[in-house]
């Protein structure tokens, strides 16, 4: 299952990629938006990323104007490794070397044909493991270290507005 998300700017490209997923017979869940009305990309990047992080979806494809804002939002969710790609080489290596579990595309940056090629190659690429697994593990340790920091999500004081340390 592939999680999908977009803001209004990314919606037309997301709809084109949905056609590609259907052609390939791949299951997906669309976390929105489904409207061309202006919306905030962090909402939809987070929803799709949380589905991937929870294991409800194996990978995610997200879209906004540049791919940058929605990828930044997704990458705040622990366990997410989202990359912005506008070329096939980076897309393939993001899977092979970095085990990227989400791909962000900018609808104002890549055209439909290039986006289809990027998505196809990203979906087909396989994580190589080996020395790359060690590096991905190092990235995960950095993430875990910051989650333990005061004020992080595991800190009970972080849930109490106005409380200072």
Tell what function each PLM region has.
Residues 3-5, 9-10, 88-165:
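C-terminal binding/interaction regions
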Residues 3-23:
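Glycine-rich phosphate/diphosphate-binding loop of Rossmann-like nucleotide-binding domains
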Residues 34-35, 65-68, 76, 88-90, ...:
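Acidic, glycine-rich active-site loops and adjacent beta-strand->loop/helix elements
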Residues 15-18, 72-76, 116:
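Short amphipathic alpha-helical segments
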Residues 44-84:
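Helix-adjacent hinge/juxtasegments
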Residues 27-38:
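A short beta-strand-loop structural module common to alpha/beta enzyme folds
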């Amino acid at each position: 299952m592939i999680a999908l998300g977009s803001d209004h700017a990314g919606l037309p490209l997301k709809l084109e990629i949905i056609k590609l997923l259907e052609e390939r017979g791949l299951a997906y869940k669309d976390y929105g938006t489904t409207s061309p009305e202006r919306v905030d990309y962090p909402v939809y990047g987070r929803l799709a990323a949380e589905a991937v992080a929870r294991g409800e979806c194996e990978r995610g494809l997200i879209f906004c104007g540049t791919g940058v804002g929605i990828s930044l939002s997704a990458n705040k969710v622990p366990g997410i490794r989202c990359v912005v790609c506008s070329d096939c080489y980076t897309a393939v290596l993001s899977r092979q070397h970095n085990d990227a579990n989400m791909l962000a595309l900018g609808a104002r940056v890549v055209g439909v044909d290039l986006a289809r090629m990027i998505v196809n190659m990203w979906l087909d690429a396989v994580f190589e493991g080996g020395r790359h697994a060690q590096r991905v593990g190092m990235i995960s340790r950095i993430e875990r270290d910051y989650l333990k920091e005061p004020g992080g999500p595991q800190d009970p004081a972080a849930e109490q507005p106005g409380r200072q340390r």
